[in-house]
């Protein structure tokens, strides 16, 4: 199973990725992890990427795609892989097809912006322990205080409404063209396109995703 998981920040991709990788016995591949591993291993592509990152630049698509091809040739990918957060742009998706990297399925976890803003902006965290609450769905016993220690809860900068809205705008700008690209692909490179309502309960989303993937 060679699959790509799409979904806005806060759509619940991470949770579903764990279910998919466990069900098919495949690794989850993210470009961040891949870059770090290549840099640590000192591969030619890793060294080239490190130089660009050290200079504050963005790693070019040809380097990323070279790394992807190296990564998916490894033994743990013999049954497939799950791409998370890659390809991120139309240029990357087109380059992947040109490089002969095919996909069996593209899974989009679809959640409206208003629901994501509500989910993320309502999160509150106890920093010392990592305990997470939600003002609506999982509130602490005392407003603004951790249940165990009574210490203050904070809202992370990433979860502030304006930040969430900015991240969503970037996601839509970059990724909606991918949705369009994959849903229109034809021939041998055309993956099965699966769109799932991510506002359902986690187990319902899991059942729908795995069912559509043939598990």
Curated annotation (Swiss-Prot):
ATP binds at residues 10-15, 123, 132-133, 200. The keyword Nucleotide-binding applies. The lineage of its organism: Bacteria, Pseudomonadati, Pseudomonadota, Betaproteobacteria, Neisseriales. Consists of three domains, a large central CORE domain and two small peripheral domains, NMPbind and LID, which undergo movements during catalysis. The LID domain closes over the site of phosphoryl transfer upon ATP binding. Assembling and dissambling the active center during each catalytic cycle provides an effective means to prevent ATP hydrolysis. InterPro entries: Adenyl_kin_sub (IPR006259), Adenylat/UMP-CMP_kin (IPR000850), Adenylat_kinase_CS (IPR033690), Adenylate_kinase_lid-dom (IPR007862), P-loop_NTPase (IPR027417). SUPFAM superfamilies: P-loop containing nucleoside triphosphate hydrolases (SSF52540). Pfam families: ADK, ADK_lid. Monomer. GO terms for molecular function: adenylate kinase activity; ATP binding. One of its GO terms (cellular component) is cytoplasm. This is Adenylate kinase. Residues 122-159 are annotated as: LID. GO terms for biological process: AMP salvage. Pathway: Purine metabolism; AMP biosynthesis via salvage pathway; AMP from ADP: step 1/1. NCBIfam families: adk (TIGR01351), PRK00279.1-1 (NF001379), PRK00279.1-2 (NF001380), PRK00279.1-3 (NF001381). Catalyzes the reversible transfer of the terminal phosphate group between ATP and AMP. Plays an important role in cellular energy homeostasis and in adenine nucleotide metabolism. The keyword ATP-binding applies. AMP binds at residues 31, 36, 57-59, 85-88, 92, 156, 167. Its EC number is 2.7.4.3. It is found in: Cytoplasm. It is an enzyme of class 2 (transferase). It catalyses: AMP + ATP = 2 ADP. The gene is adk. Belongs to the adenylate kinase family. Residues 30-59 are annotated as: NMP. Keywords: ATP-binding, Cytoplasm, Kinase, Nucleotide biosynthesis, Nucleotide-binding, Transferase.
